[in-house]
């Protein structure tokens, strides 16, 4: 029964449950014209949500699917530039990142400069509207403030995970995000 946590939309990936295998998901641009890739199912729903909000160009994808190699490069770069404490707080070890499933997306509010590791995605304005509708499109804010002890990850208000509409709604209703 516990084997199910390693597959499907509810796949659990973290330091205790590293990703299994190197199967690349079917990918698509996270939003039209974007070079950031996402699982095609998640990309379609993200496009629908951003379109509904008329927020194309305001909400921008920063990071989606990552290969093992890319995750290693991000880890190594952050260690050099930010140090070990920061890196352990905000960057997952290779094999332990939800991004490697293609189901996770880091989003930002459009700005001249966007921080790749901690992009700005505030709780008001169009970003707040995004959050209010996210579950209806299958997304949850994965690492909420106050849940660090449960997730083992620092709060990341920019990080959204596609789990599918019924799961996202249930998780929102029961406070499981």
Summary of predicted features, one role per range:
Residues 1-64, 68-177:
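Extracytoplasmic cell-surface/polysaccharide-interacting catalytic and binding patches
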């Amino acid at each position: 029964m516990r084997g199910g946590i390693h597959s499907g939309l509810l796949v659990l990936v973290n330091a205790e449950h590293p990703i299994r295998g190197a199967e690349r998901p079917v990918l698509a641009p996270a939003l039209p014209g974007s070079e950031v890739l996402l699982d095609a199912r998640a990309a379609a729903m993200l496009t629908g949500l951003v379109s509904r909000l008329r927020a194309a160009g305001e909400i921008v994808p920063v990071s989606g699917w990552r290969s093992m190699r890319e995750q290693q490069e991000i880890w190594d770069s952050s260690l050099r530039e930010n140090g070990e404490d920061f890196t352990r707080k905000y960057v997952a070890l290779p094999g332990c990142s939800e991004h490697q499933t293609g189901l996770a997306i880091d989003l930002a509010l459009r700005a001249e400069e966007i921080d790749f590791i901690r992009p700005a995605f505030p709780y008001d304005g169009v970003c707040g509207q995004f959050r209010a509708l996210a579950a209806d499109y299958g997304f949850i804010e994965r690492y909420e403030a106050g849940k660090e002890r449960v997730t083992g990850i620092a709060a990341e208000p920019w990080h959204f995970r596609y789990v599918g509409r019924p799961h996202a709604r249930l998780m929102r209703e029961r406070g499981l995000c």
